[in-house]
A protein has these predicted regions:
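Extended, compositionally biased flexible segments
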Residues: 69, 73-120
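Intrinsically disordered, low-complexity linker/loop segments enriched in Gly/Pro
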Residues: 98-101, 106-118, 129-219
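Bacterial N-terminal signal peptides that target proteins for export
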Residues: 1-10
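Conserved mixed alpha/beta catalytic, RNA-binding, or beta-rich assembly cores of soluble enzyme
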Residues: 184-295, 307
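Short, Lys/Arg- and Gly-enriched loop/turn segments at beta-strand edges
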Residues: 68-80, 135-145, 233-243, 334-337
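Alpha/propeptide regions of enzymes that mature by internal proteolysis
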Residues: 27-30, 34-40, 48-62, 67-68, ...
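Long, compositionally biased
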Residues: 339-362
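Hydrophobic h-region of N-terminal signal peptides that target proteins for export
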Residues: 14-22
Length: 362
């Protein structure tokens, strides 16, 4: 094992392992981005829009996001949520405004995305690190929605089955029923840079190399997501906010609930050139990803990413990396419902006597 490891996705700087492990203090919020009709798109991700906000690398932004649930029918959000006893003053005004004024493009997807955020200095071949400092629910309720064509069992239900679920944010649980409570673990289902120029515009439904709808429930506060950059400025979008979701997201949705995210954006020059897929990290694990229409192919990709990571970052031989992946790395299904499916690998940091310092202890 090397004595000093490169910071994950090397930036040309080495970080000594003797540095104290204390987490960095919460950064100052440099800008805010509200989810208004002029700062959101509905159902797609594109490299062909002017920035909703321009920032410098290292800056932190407080971003409002809006769930699409309650915005997809003929009735407006206030009427939709009133059916479950949600008072009108608890329905977000920006959700009502978006429903009334933002057009949906036929054939694309359902997600309302805030952005794009243009990060100065980001260029193709770089890597954008998104540090998730805080995720705060904006409403005390969420929606799980399924139906006859939804999820991994599309023939199971004969009728749409929307379920509006109250959230107890003081106790940090979702009140699924009188005798079932689910611990909350908010995260953003979609975090994405703009796709490559040869693609230009994509539906927000399938995840891919630029991130997108990865529905990865490990991306809670205290985690980092690493995305390859394909365009000048990176052009970051986010949305599809979740209060909690299990691996697989098997009926097609989580508890979908609007939230405010505090995110820090850091450009790592040249570090995206060799990236095949996004990666992630938290205080306890490194995460690799594989995506494909075929879950078996996604599994092979996630395994290959894991082997490559262990070789590149820890100096293992191919044989040892493959062996370690088999005996110590768990592979799980992040989501199996977005046409393109995603497998992730969990590499425990505790396997290694020495690992680089991470910014968060959570």
């Amino acid at each position: 094992m090397v004595k000093i490891l490169k910071r994950w996705f090397a930036t040309g700087l080495l970080i000594a392992l003797s540095c104290p492990a204390a987490a960095q203090p919460a950064p100052t919020v440099d800008a805010t981005l509200a989810s208004r009709p002029e700062t959101v798109v509905w159902g797609y991700i594109t490299a062909d829009l002017p920035p909703a906000l321009t920032i410098k690398s290292g800056q932190t932004v407080k971003i409002d996001t809006v769930s699409h649930q309650g915005l997809l029918g003929k009735e407006d959000p206030a009427a939709f949520f009133a059916s479950a006893g949600i008072a009108k003053d608890q329905v977000l005004q920006d959700a009502i405004d978006i429903y009334k004024t933002v057009p949906r493009t036929k054939g694309l997807s359902v997600h309302v995305l805030t952005g794009p955020i243009y990060v100065e200095g980001a260029a193709p071949g770089d890597m954008l690190e998104v540090r998730i400092h805080n995720l705060e629910l904006r409403v005390p309720y969420g929606v799980n929605n399924s139906g006859p064509t939804s999820g991994v069992l599309p023939g199971l239900l004969s009728e749409p089955a929307p379920k509006i679920i109250k959230l107890d944010t003081k106790r940090n649980v979702a009140l699924f029923s009188d005798d079932i409570e689910v611990p909350l673990a908010p995260f953003l289902g979609i975090m994405s840079v703009a796709p490559s120029r040869d693609v230009l515009l994509v539906s927000s439904r399938p995840p891919w190399r630029w991130g997108g709808n990865i529905d990865f429930n490990k991306l809670v506060a205290g985690a980092s997501l690493y995305l390859p950059v394909f365009n000048t400025g990176a052009q970051f979008y986010t949305g599809d906010p979740h209060a909690v979701q299990a691996d697989g997201e098997v009926n097609g949705t989580a508890i979908e609930a609007s939230l405010t995210a505090t995110l820090q954006f850091i450009v790592h020059k040249g570090a995206g050139k060799a990236m095949n897929w996004p990666r992630a990290e938290d205080a306890t694990h490194y995460y690799t990803m594989g995506m494909d229409l075929d879950l078996n192919v996604a599994m092979r990709q996630a395994t290959r990413e894991t082997v490559n990571f262990l070789r590149e970052e820890f100096g293992l031989s191919t044989e040892d990396a493959y062996a370690l992946a088999s005996i110590a790395v768990d592979f799980r299904v992040a989501e199996a419902v977005d046409s393109v499916q995603m497998i992730y690998g969990m590499i425990p940091k505790k396997l290694f006597k020495q690992t680089p310092q991470f910014w968060s202890k959570r």
